[in-house]
């Protein structure tokens, strides 16, 4: 049987790299073509694979149509994972819109330029951000829900527009897989002001990096049914990965041996609304088709993530709570991006993320933002 050719964008990013690794493990059946920016970091990362005949690296740019066309030409599958994501997307919103929408246009144009585009199956990676603010009691939803991005969220808008480009292009085989938050080792060490844009009372249904990579490989298998295509699906690692944002913060700090959120953050630092995240009524549909979940227990996965961090992160438990708090405080007050900077300097964002001055001033303790327990498995849904 002839090998299939898979073209993947964003292969040096978190999800893309996990997908590449899964495909590479199946290289007896797949030739893998990668479009990557020509940088020292990417050269170093891809060096071990450059001599492998099953891997072709195109050094280029998603915004250059000719580079995208080189990747698409002759491909059986196109996995469009690349684009700008947070935190870069938060700092450069206009560029994010331009790059994410422009790259989607280039991919579709390149597919349509093929002699028989109907033979190409294209996978677009969307985002849970497309649904916008879904705080309780409106925290359950599915892929048919309206897409209402949060205010100021150009990333979410770019994902909505890009998905529409694929859906309306007349392609015979397209699918949008809307990614949630990805649990990968580096997330335990990511520190930036956007952490405080996340309401503690909000929710998210997470996906592990391993499941996400396996998903990208599974979708390229011959046994995927025809009726899978031309739809949108939500990605998650299942009901056990449903967490409130407060619960996630607790798990993350605990994994590093750090004190609870109450001891290292002020409750006012966290926004009250205008983010994204929900729990899925249709969470299992995608796995029932593609069988990508490993069903690793949540606590075990957090322990695995910690084990993959550099050694010095394992010493985090030595830091006293007051020192951690002093380290984190500047991010809440960072000019332009910090929630506490908005309080005095950006009334539009302040209102969008807190609702009102009264709502902000009503936050007097963690009891005012700590969410009540939520039922994670609702049979009636």
Where are the regions a protein language model picked out?
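Conserved glycine-rich Rossmann-like NAD(P)H-binding loop of the short-chain dehydrogenase/reductase
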Residues: 28-41
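Mid/C-terminal beta-alpha module of Rossmann-like enzyme folds, strongest
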Residues: 221-291, 295-320, 327-381
């Amino acid at each position: 049987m002839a090998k299939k050719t898979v073209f993947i964008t964003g292969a040096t990013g978190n999800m893309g790299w996990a997908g590449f690794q899964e495909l590479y493990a199946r290289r007896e059946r797949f030739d893998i073509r990668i479009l990557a920016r020509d940088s020292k970091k990417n050269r170093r990362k891809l060096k071990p694979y450059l001599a492998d005949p099953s891997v072709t690296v195109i050094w280029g740019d998603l915004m250059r149509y000719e580079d995208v066309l080189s990747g698409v030409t002759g491909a059986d599958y196109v996995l469009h994972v690349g684009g700008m994501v947070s935190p870069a997307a938060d700092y450069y919103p206009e560029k994010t819109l331009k790059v994410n929408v422009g790259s989607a246009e280039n991919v579709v144009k390149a597919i349509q330029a093929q002699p028989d585009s109907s033979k190409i199956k294209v996978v677009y990676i969307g985002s849970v951000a497309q649904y916008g603010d879904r705080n309780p009691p409106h925290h359950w939803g599915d892929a048919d829900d309206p897409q209402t991005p949060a205010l100021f969220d150009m990333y979410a808008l770019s994902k909505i527009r890009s998905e529409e480009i694929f859906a309306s292009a007349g392609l015979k085989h397209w699918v949008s897989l809307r990614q949630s938050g990805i649990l990968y080792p580096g997330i335990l060490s990511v520190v930036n002001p956007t952490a405080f844009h996340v309401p503690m009372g909000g929710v998210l249904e997470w996906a592990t990096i391993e499941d996400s990579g396996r998903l990208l490989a599974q979708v390229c298998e011959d046994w995927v049914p025809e009726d899978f295509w031309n739809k949108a699906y939500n990605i998650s690692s299942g009901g056990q990965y449903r967490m409130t944002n407060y619960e996630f913060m607790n798990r993350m700090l605990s994994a590093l041996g750090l004190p609870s959120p109450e001891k290292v953050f002020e409750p006012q630092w966290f926004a009250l609304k205008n983010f994204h995240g929900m729990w899925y009524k249709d969470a299992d549909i995608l796995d029932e088709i593609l069988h990508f979940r490993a069903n690793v227990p949540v606590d075990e996965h957090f322990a695995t993530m910690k084990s993959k961090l550099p050694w010095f992160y394992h010493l985090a438990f030595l830091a006293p709570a007051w020192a951690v708090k002093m380290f984190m405080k500047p991010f809440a007050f960072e000019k332009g991006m910090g929630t506490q900077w908005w309080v005095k300097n950006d009334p539009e964002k302040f209102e969008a993320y807190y609702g009102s001055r009264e709502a902000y001033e009503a936050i007097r303790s963690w009891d005012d933002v700590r969410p009540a327990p939520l039922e994670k498995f609702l049979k009636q849904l």
